[in-house]
C-alpha cells in the first residue's frame, strides 16, 4: 500500500536552485521560436481550409498542435516564474515548478507533432520516376518518422514521467501532479485526433473517425 507523507511543519523545505528553472526557461524560449517559424511556414503545404479573413489556407493538423504548444509553453512560463520565492535568492520551492516542467514537455511534444505529422503525410503522396527511387525515398521517410516518434515519445511520456519520479515534493503533491498530467494527455489526444479527422479524413472522403486513444501514440497516425 502506498504510504502518503504527512505534512510536518518541521520537515525540510524543498529548495531548488534557480538555475534549474532558468535552464527550462531557455528550452521554452527555443520552443517558442520554433513554433513561430512553423506557423509562418505552414503556407507552403498544399490543401487546407480557405477561411474568410485569412490570406493563406489553414492546415488544422499544423495549426492545432502548434496552438496547443504555444498555450502550454505560456502556461509553463507562468508556472516557472510563480514557483520561485520573492526574496534575494529566488530559490524555487513551490510545486508549480514540476507542473511547469510537465507543461514544457507536453508543449515540446506538440511542436514535434505540428512539424513531423503534416510533412510526413505530404511525403506519402510523392511519386518518383522509378521503383528504386521510390524504395529509397520510402526508407528515408521511415527513418524521419522514427526520429520524430522518438522525439515525441521522449517529450510526451519520458520527460514527464522522470519529472514525477524525481519530484522532491510529498507523495500527495506528486499524485496530484500525476493526475494533472494524465488529464492533459487525454485532452491533447482528443484534440489532436479531432484535428487529424478534419484535415485528413474529411478531405479524403472518409467518414470513419480516428479513435481519440490513438492520439496517445500520435506517431502511429503520421
What do these predicted regions represent?
Residues 1-2, 6-7, 50-52, 56-57:
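Short, contiguous, well-ordered secondary-structure segments
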Residues 1-22, 27:
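N-terminal juxtamembrane cytosolic/stromal segments of multi-pass membrane proteins
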Residues 12, 16, 34, 127-132:
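Generic detector of bulky aromatic hydrophobic side chains
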Residues 20-41:
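The first (N-terminal) embedded transmembrane alpha-helix
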Residues 39-51:
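Membrane-interface helix-loop junction between the first two transmembrane segments
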Residues 52-222:
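Alpha-helical transmembrane segments of integral membrane proteins
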Amino acid at each position: 500500500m502506498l504510504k502518503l507523507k504527512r505534512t510536518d511543519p518541521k520537515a525540510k523545505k524543498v529548495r531548488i536552485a534557480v538555475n534549474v528553472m532558468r535552464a527550462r526557461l531557455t528550452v521554452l524560449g527555443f520552443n517558442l521560436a520554433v513554433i513561430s517559424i512553423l506557423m509562418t511556414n505552414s503556407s507552403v503545404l498544399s490543401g487546407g481550409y480557405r477561411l474568410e479573413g485569412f490570406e493563406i489556407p489553414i492546415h488544422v493538423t499544423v495549426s492545432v498542435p502548434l496552438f496547443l504548444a504555444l498555450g502550454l509553453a505560456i502556461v509553463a512560463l507562468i508556472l516557472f516564474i510563480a514557483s520561485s520565492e520573492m526574496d534575494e535568492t529566488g530559490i524555487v520551492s513551490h510545486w508549480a515548478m514540476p507542473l511547469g516542467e510537465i507543461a514544457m514537455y507536453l508543449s515540446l511534444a506538440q511542436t514535434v507533432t505540428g512539424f513531423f505529422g503534416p510533412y510526413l503525410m505530404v511525403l506519402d503522396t510523392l511519386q518518383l520516376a522509378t521503383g528504386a527511387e521510390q524504395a529509397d525515398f520510402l526508407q528515408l521517410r521511415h527513418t524521419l518518422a522514427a526520429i520524430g516518434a522518438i522525439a515525441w515519445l521522449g517529450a510526451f511520456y519520458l520527460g514527464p514521467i522522470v519529472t514525477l519520479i524525481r519530484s522532491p515534493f510529498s507523495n500527495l503533491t506528486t499524485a496530484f501532479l500525476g493526475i494533472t498530467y494524465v488529464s492533459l494527455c487525454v485532452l491533447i489526444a482528443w484534440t489532436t485526433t479531432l484535428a487529424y479527422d478534419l484535415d485528413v479524413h474529411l478531405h479524403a472522403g472518409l467518414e470513419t473517425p480516428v479513435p481519440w486513444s490513438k492520439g496517445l501514440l500520435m506517431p502511429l497516425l503520421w
